[in-house]
Structure formats: C-alpha cells, structure tokens
C-alpha cells in the first residue's frame, strides 16, 4: 500500500477576514478583505477530457498538451481525447494545487454633506492567490461554474432633518 495523504483538505482549515472603516472630515472609507489558507484545489482531470460532443476543453489546456503530432515533452497537460482516458482521469497530485487566497471583497468611498451622502462601492475587486486557473473561492472541480461577479455601485443617500 503506497497511498498517502498529500496537500491540504479541499475545505479550508483557516478562513479569515478583516476590514476597518475610516472617516476624515467629509470623507469615509471602508474595506473588507477575506481569505482562506491551508486548502488544496483538486482540478478535475476528467471534465476537460470527457465524452465526445459533450464538453469543451479549457483554452489553457488546449494550448499546452502532448500529442503524437506535437510531442512536446515539456507540455503542461497530458494527452487530450474525446473519450475517457484511464491515465488522465485517476486522482493524482498532478491535479492538486494550492487553493489559498486573499480577496478584496468590498471597498467603499463616500463623501458626506449636510443633507446627502454620495458613495462608490465595489465588490470582489482583487484576488491574490498562487492558483491562477479560476476563482479559487469556487474550489475544486473544472472551473466551468459561474465565478463570483465583480460589482460596482454608485449611490446617493438623502437625509431629511427637522
């Protein structure tokens, strides 16, 4: 029996967040960072190589794989096929990646006046991670799910004082 545990679990062992708020004269500023550590992402080796006519191959895989016509021994990915390949679909540390990340989840800047406040808010603005294939917050799999959307809002809040 030569099996052993590798990497970290696919559920983060550490999740964290922090975010201060500041006011200076008529301006306010707040942000929130969220992150995860001690987590692995298992890229699904089956999905890109699935059944004929049912799936597409991610571009980064299609650009760098071994084939008989392109026998690049330094290719990043194993051979492609329209059918299941036993050598490509077995669980392997080849598909395991570090899934740690730090995200700037929210940032808001506002200007306060006596009767109103104007603000600009952004969500999911930046991601810092060694994992570059898809949003690491999506976790393991194929990366073909919808990622967290980046959102920008501009708003005005009015106050009526008696």
Predicted regions and their residues:
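Membrane-embedded beta-strand positions of outer-membrane beta-barrel proteins
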Residues: 31, 118-120, 156
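C-terminal beta-signal and terminal closure region of outer-membrane beta-barrel proteins
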Residues: 65-72, 76, 89, 127-162
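Transmembrane beta-barrel domains of outer membrane proteins
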Residues: 19-23, 32, 110-112, 145, ...
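Extracytoplasmic gating/loop element in the C-terminal half of outer-membrane beta-barrel translocons
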Residues: 36-117, 122
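Transmembrane beta-strands of outer-membrane beta-barrel pores
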Residues: 24-26, 35-39, 106, 122-129, ...
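Repeated loop/turn-to-beta-strand initiation elements of outer-membrane beta-barrel proteins
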Residues: 26-29, 115-116
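Residues that define the transmembrane beta-barrel architecture of outer-membrane proteins
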Residues: 12-16, 96, 100-105, 148-152
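Conserved small-residue
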Residues: 1-10, 70
